[in-house]
């Protein structure tokens, strides 16, 4: 009887997981530090802003964990931010990694932070290659954001360079996202 209950619970958990879509590697799983503080982020946001970290690229989970820890250390220790700046990050391994996560305001696009989620690709996409699994992960994450009510269904997608004087998100990402359905020029 206990095994049947356990099996039923496992099926329900898996069904819930599948309904939410893309798997997000938690901050604890990649060895991130807890935030010093958080600011709540509203629901049904109007914007998603795409970035690149302009740093090291990673191809494996272990490499991505190390890069994430480095980005977080730079943001917290050098810039004095309470946490890594982005809500989510995507590695060359195709995984989505938790940054500030859902419902916490990021520090990725100045005055746009209260109205947007920030998604960053690990690497410098002026020369690093954007792989199909990374594109798929980003699109699934955006769909999840709409399904969970974090983004409005009519959200607008911008590259960071559209809201700030920067090369971010790099030429390769810039060329890719301009073909996505929610992108606005």
UniProtKB/Swiss-Prot annotation:
Molecular-function GO terms, alphabetical: N-acetylmuramoyl-L-alanine amidase activity; peptidoglycan binding; zinc ion binding
Essential cofactor(s): Zn(2+)
The entry's Zn(2+)-binding residues are 51, 160, 168
Q: Which UniProt keywords apply?
A: Disulfide bond, Hydrolase, Immunity, Innate immunity, Metal-binding, Secreted, Signal, Zinc
Name recorded for this polypeptide: Peptidoglycan-recognition protein SC1a/b
List the residue(s) that the UniProt entry marks as the site Important for catalytic activity: 86
Q: What is the top-level taxon of the source organism?
A: Eukaryota
Q: Where is the N-acetylmuramoyl-L-alanine amidase domain?
A: 46-170
Question: Looking at its record, which EC class is this enzyme?
Answer: hydrolase
Instruction: Tell me the GO BP annotations in alphabetical order.
Output: innate immune response; peptidoglycan catabolic process
Q: Could you tell me where this protein is found in the cell?
A: Secreted
Q: List the disulfide bonds.
A: 58-64
Cite the Pfam families for this sequence. Amidase_2 (PF01510)
> EC number(s) for this protein?
3.5.1.28
**Annotated signal sequence range:** 1-21
Species per Swiss-Prot/TrEMBL record: Drosophila simulans (Fruit fly)
For this protein's source organism, the top of the classification is: Eukaryota, Metazoa, Ecdysozoa, Arthropoda, Hexapoda
What InterPro entries does the record tag this protein with? Amidase/PGRP_sf (IPR036505), Amidase_domain (IPR002502), Peptidoglycan_recognition (IPR017331), PGRP (IPR015510), PGRP_domain_met/bac (IPR006619)
Q: Name one GO cellular component term.
A: extracellular region
Give the chief site where it resides.
Answer: secreted
**Which PANTHER family has this protein been placed in?**
PEPTIDOGLYCAN RECOGNITION PROTEIN (PTHR11022), PEPTIDOGLYCAN-RECOGNITION PROTEIN SB1-RELATED (PTHR11022:SF75)
Q: Which reaction does it catalyse?
A: Hydrolyzes the link between N-acetylmuramoyl residues and L-amino acid residues in certain cell-wall glycopeptides
């Amino acid at each position: 009887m206990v095994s049947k209950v356990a099996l039923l619970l496992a099926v329900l958990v898996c069904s819930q997981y599948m309904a939410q879509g893309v798997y997000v590697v938690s901050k604890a799983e990649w060895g991130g530090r807890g935030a010093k503080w958080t600011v709540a982020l509203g629901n049904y946001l109007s914007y998603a802003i795409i970035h690149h970290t302009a740093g090291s690229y990673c191809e494996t989970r272990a490499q991505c964990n190390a890069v994430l820890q480095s980005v977080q250390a730079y943001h917290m220790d050098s810039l004095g931010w309470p946490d890594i700046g982005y809500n989510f990050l995507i590695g060359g391994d195709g995984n989505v990694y938790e940054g500030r996560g859902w419902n916490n305001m990021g520090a990725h696009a100045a005055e746009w932070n209260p109205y947007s989620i920030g998604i960053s690709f690990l690497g410098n996409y002026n020369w690093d290659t954007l792989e199909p699994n990374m594109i798929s992960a980003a699109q699934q994450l955006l769909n999840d954001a709409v399904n969970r009510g974090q983004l409005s269904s009519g959200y607008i997608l911008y590259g960071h360079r559209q809201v700030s004087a920067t090369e971010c998100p790099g030429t390769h990402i810039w060329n890719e996202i301009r073909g996505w359905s929610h992108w606005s020029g």
